[in-house]
A protein has these predicted regions:
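Contiguous, non-catalytic segments that form substrate-binding/exosite surfaces or channel walls
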Residues: 1-247, 253
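Post-HEXXH active-site segment of zinc metalloproteases
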Residues: 272-293
C-alpha cells in the first residue's frame, strides 16, 4: 500500500498495476482511459472496480449532476451542444468509458458555443499511478476580445511544431484541431474550487488529441484577479534581485505570463506524439510531472522566439526575460512557500517547475547562466545569460519529449527524482521566514457568485 488516496482500497501498487495492465491491448490504437472513473477494491480476496455512476459509487451526487445536465440540455445553445450534454448524461448513467470518449470527441468538435463547460472525472494528479481522476466542473463564456491572441497562436500551431528543438520522429506530422480561446469562468466546482487552474487543455486522451484535436482555454478573469492581487503586495520587492528585473517584470510580466499559459495549453500539451505501441500510462507516477514539464518547456522555449514579435504578440525581443526570471525565481525559490518545513515536493506542477529550474541551473553552471547571489544575508536568483538559458530549455524540452514519446520510465523517474523532488532545507527555511513577514497566503481561492 503506497498511496494515501482512496482510489485503491486495500490494494497494493503492484496489484493495481497488474490489474490494469491485464486489461490493456497493446495493439488497440483507441484505448479507453482505464480505471478513470472507479475505485479499485478487494472483495473476498478478489480485485474489483466500484464504478462512479448512477446506481454505483457516489450515485446520490451523480444523480444530482444528471438532474442539472438534463435541465441544461433543454436550454442548449445549439444542436452540437445538446448532443454533447446528452452523451455526457449517458456516460454518467452507464459509467462506460467508451461513451466518455464519444462525449469527449463531440465536446472537442463543438467550437461554436459561446457558453461552454468542463464536467466529469478529468485530471489524475491525485492518483500516484496517474489513472484515476477527480471530479471537476467549470461553466464559462468566451471572451471575444482576448481570444484574438490565442487564435493567432493556434493558427500558427504547425509552424511551432515544425520548428521546435524536438527530434523529428517525436513530432506530429500534421497538427490537428488545435482550438484555443480565452474564457471568463462563471462558476467553479469540484477539484477546480475554490482554487482553480488558470489554463485547461482537454481531453487528456492521447489518441483523441491526435485524431480529433483538443480545446485549450486560458481563464482570463482568474488570471486577471491573480495579477491584480500580486501588484503592490511586496512579494517581488522581497524576492527579485534588482531594479533591472523589477522593471522588466512591471513592464512585461502580466503579458508574458498570459502568453506562457496560452503556449503551454494551446500548443505544449497538444505537441509531439507517442511512438507506435507506447502505453500512454508508461511513465506511471511520473507521467503528470513529465507532461506538465513538457508543456511548460514548450511555452518557455517559444515565449522567447522572434516569431512572437513578428506575430505582434509581444512588443519587443526583451519581453520574454520577465517570464524567464519569474519562472526561475519561482521554481528555484519562491514556490517553496507552499511546502511545510522538512517536507519534499509532492505535487506534479511544483515538481515540474523545480525540475526545469534546477536542471537549467545545474546544466548552465559552468557558464554561470544562472546563479544564486547573496545580499544582506538574503538569497536571490540571478540570470546572467538569457540566450544560453533558452538554449538549455530547448535541450531539456527535446529530452522530455523523447521520454514521453518512448515511454522511457527509468529516464523519467531519474529526471523527476534528481531535480524535481528534493528541497534544500537551508534555502527553504530562509524563504519561509522572508515570506512570513509579508503576511500573504501561499494559495488564493475564489468565491462562487450567486446567480
Amino acid at each position: 500500500l503506497t498511496s494515501a488516496c482512496n482510489y485503491y482500497d486495500g490494494v497494493t501498487q503492484k496489484e493495481a498495476e497488474r490489474f490494469y495492465s491485464d486489461m490493456k491491448d497493446p495493439k488497440d490504437e483507441t484505448p479507453v482511459s482505464y480505471g478513470l472513473n472507479s475505485r479499485l477494491v478487494k472483495e473476498n480476496g478478489k480485485l474489483t472496480e466500484k464504478v462512479w455512476k448512477v446506481g454505483g459509487l457516489y450515485t446520490q451526487a451523480i444523480e444530482k449532476i444528471v438532474y442539472w445536465l438534463k435541465k441544461a440540455e433543454g436550454v442548449a445553445e445549439n444542436p452540437e451542444q445538446k448532443a454533447v450534454i446528452a452523451e455526457l448524461i449517458k456516460f454518467y448513467e452507464t459509467g462506460d468509458l467508451k461513451t466518455f470518449d464519444e462525449y469527449a470527441i463531440l465536446w472537442v468538435k463543438d467550437l461554436n458555443s459561446l457558453v461552454d463547460f468542463v464536467n466529469g472525472f478529468t485530471e489524475s494528479y491525485g492518483d500516484p499511478l496517474g489513472m484515476k481522476a477527480s471530479w471537476e466542473s467549470l461553466v464559462n463564456f468566451k471572451d471575444m476580445e482576448a481570444t484574438h491572441r490565442t487564435e493567432i497562436i493556434s493558427g500558427n500551431a504547425q509552424w511551432f511544431e515544425d520548428h521546435s528543438p524536438v527530434d523529428k520522429q517525436f513530432k506530429k506530422d500534421e497538427v490537428k484541431g488545435v482550438s484555443a480561446k480565452v474564457i471568463t469562468a462563471a462558476i467553479l466546482a469540484g477539484d477546480l474550487y475554490p482554487a482553480t487552474a488558470i489554463g485547461i487543455n482537454l481531453p487528456n486522451s492521447n489518441w483523441i488529441r491526435s485524431h480529433h484535436g483538443s480545446k485549450s482555454v486560458t481563464i482570463g478573469n482568474i488570471t486577471d484577479a491573480y495579477n491584480k492581487a500580486a501588484h503592490g503586495n511586496g512579494f517581488n520587492e522581497e524576492f527579485v534581485y534588482s531594479d533591472a528585473e523589477l522593471q522588466l517584470i512591471d513592464k512585461y510580466a502580466d503579458l508574458t505570463g498570459e502568453l506562457h499559459t496560452d503556449l503551454h495549453e494551446c500548443l505544449g500539451h497538444g505537441s509531439g506524439k507517442l511512438l507506435p505501441g507506447v502505453d500512454p500510462d508508461a511513465l506511471k507516477a511520473y507521467g503528470s510531472t513529465i507532461e506538465e514539464a513538457r508543456a511548460d518547456l514548450f511555452g518557455l522555449y517559444y515565449v522567447a522566439d522572434p516569431k512572437l514579435v513578428e506575430l505582434k504578440l509581444v512588443p519587443d525581443a526583451e519581453a520574454y526575460k520577465a517570464e524567464y526570471y519569474t519562472f526561475l525565481m519561482n521554481g528555484l525559490m519562491t514556490q517553496l512557500t507552499r511546502i511545510e518545513p522538512g517536507k519534499n515536493i509532492e505535487e506534479s506542477h511544483m515538481r515540474n517547475r523545480q525540475l526545469i529550474a534546477r536542471w537549467a541551473y545545474e546544466h548552465g553552471k559552468a557558464d554561470k547562466v544562472i546563479e544564486f547571489a547573496k545580499r544582506d544575508g538574503k538569497t536571490y536568483v540571478v540570470v546572467n545569460d538569457y540566450e544560453k538559458l533558452r538554449t538549455l530549455l530547448g535541450q531539456l524540452l527535446a529530452e522530455v519529449q523523447r521520454i514521453k514519446s518512448e515511454g522511457d520510465y527509468e529516464s523519467g523517474k531519474n529526471l523527476v527524482e534528481q531535480y524535481g523532488v528534493i528541497v534544500d532545507p537551508e534555502l527553504h527555511k530562509e524563504v519561509l521566514a522572508r515570506y512570513e513577514n509579508l503576511h500573504i497566503a501561499p494559495y488564493k481561492g475564489f468565491v462562487n457568485p450567486v446567480y
